[in-house]
């Protein structure tokens, strides 16, 4: 149990270490923070906090730094409720006033804004096609025996697949099939097409069963074939400007991890709804246990389709970063919902 005095000392140490990147001693706390207690008392309390697992002592210093547990306690119980200033919110809105032509452009811009405001590295996971509702389908006859399937999702993204069909299928057949598929599948998530819906489609288009089989399979497999579902990084240099990453080997290791998209996806797959704060070892990836990630999902028509996040040192400005990620995730969802690109 941490009493009020220990809470104040822990808060002072975390805040001081975040701003200076230097281990914090009892004299520093006594001078800089008006806690009304002597350096000796602070020293004893710091020793207790270390024994409880909230502080660590670097080998080369007499001062202390927060442990993962210390940061976690700070984020959960001590940190002031985060919010952006009106000027910062206005800055974000103005950035998005420029014309955005695609979801890719939108996410690239988001990565730049996120890294600029936080001064850390932005990590953006683009939408999973299978989680975005269908808006329009069109089957087009390219030549006898070859058809193009055009898929438009509610977030504005466009997908197309060409495939072979029996040579006697006509453009009129494709118009009829397209009309029925649009009537049945509008607003449906590609990965959640119900069996009952498939039965209805088969019933109305019994004479085109082979065409329907191929079309539905292509729609259902959007995620597997989706080349746009990727990781976007912004402000990578920001991470390497941090004192913690001046070591060349650390930089190499971190770069190696960031190049392995499946590992970043694995981190995102562990996240819950809302803003997530993962600190050090909580990321479950030894190579980046000196880092923290703050991330949140963004939505399209109520469905979580991707994530935005910030990767930085465990010595991160948590309150400011949480506020930025929270605001941007909501604003990004709003833009996607309004299809302003």
Curated annotation (Swiss-Prot):
Function, as annotated? Negative regulator of class I heat shock genes (grpE-dnaK-dnaJ and groELS operons). Prevents heat-shock induction of these operons.
Key word Repressor present in the record? yes
Q: Name one GO molecular function term.
A: DNA binding
Offer one example of a GO biological process linked to this entry.
negative regulation of DNA-templated transcription
Entry-linked Pfam families: HrcA (PF01628)
**Name of the molecule in the record:** Heat-inducible transcription repressor HrcA
Record organism: Carboxydothermus hydrogenoformans (strain ATCC BAA-161 / DSM 6008 / Z-2901)
Q: Name the keywords, alphabetized.
A: Repressor, Stress response, Transcription, Transcription regulation
Question: Has keyword Plastid?
Answer: no
The family this protein is said to belong to: Belongs to the HrcA family.
């Amino acid at each position: 149990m941490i009493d009020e005095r220990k809470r104040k000392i822990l808060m002072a140490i975390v805040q001081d270490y975040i701003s200076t990147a230097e281990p914090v001693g009892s004299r520093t706390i006594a001078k800089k923070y008006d806690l009304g207690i002597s350096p000796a008392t602070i020293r004893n309390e710091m020793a207790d906090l270390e024994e409880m697992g909230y502080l660590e002592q670097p080998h080369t210093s007499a001062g202390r730094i927060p442990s993962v547990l210390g940061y976690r306690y700070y984020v959960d119980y001590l940190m002031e409720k985060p919010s952006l200033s009106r000027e910062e919110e206005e800055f974000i809105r103005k950035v998005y006033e420029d014309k955005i032509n695609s979801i890719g452009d939108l996410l690239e811009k988001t990565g730049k804004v996120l890294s600029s405001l936080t001064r850390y590295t932005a990590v953006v996971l683009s939408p999973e096609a299978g989680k975005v509702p269908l808006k329009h389908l069109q089957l087009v006859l390219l030549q006898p025996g070859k058809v193009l399937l055009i898929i438009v999702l509610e977030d504005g993204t466009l997908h197309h697949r060409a495939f072979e069909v029996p040579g006697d299928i006509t453009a009129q057949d494709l118009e009829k099939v397209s009309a029925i598929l649009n009537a049945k599948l509008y607003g449906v998530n590609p990965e959640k097409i119900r069996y009952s819906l498939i039965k209805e489609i088969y019933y109305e288009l019994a004479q085109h069963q082979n065409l329907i089989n191929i079309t539905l399979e292509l729609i259902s497999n959007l995620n597997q074939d989706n080349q746009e579902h990727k990781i976007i990084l912004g402000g990578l240099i920001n991470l390497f400007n941090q004192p913690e990453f001046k070591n060349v080997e650390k930089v190499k290791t971190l770069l190696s991890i960031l190049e392995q998209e499946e590992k970043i996806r694995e981190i995102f797959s562990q996240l819950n709804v809302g803003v997530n704060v993962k600190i050090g070892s909580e990321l479950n990836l030894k190579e980046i246990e000196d880092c923290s990630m703050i991330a949140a999902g963004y939505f399209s028509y109520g469905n979580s389709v991707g994530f935005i996040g910030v990767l930085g040192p465990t010595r991160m400005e948590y309150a400011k970063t949480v506020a930025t990620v929270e605001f941007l995730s909501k604003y990004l969802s709003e833009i996607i919902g309004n299809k302003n690109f």
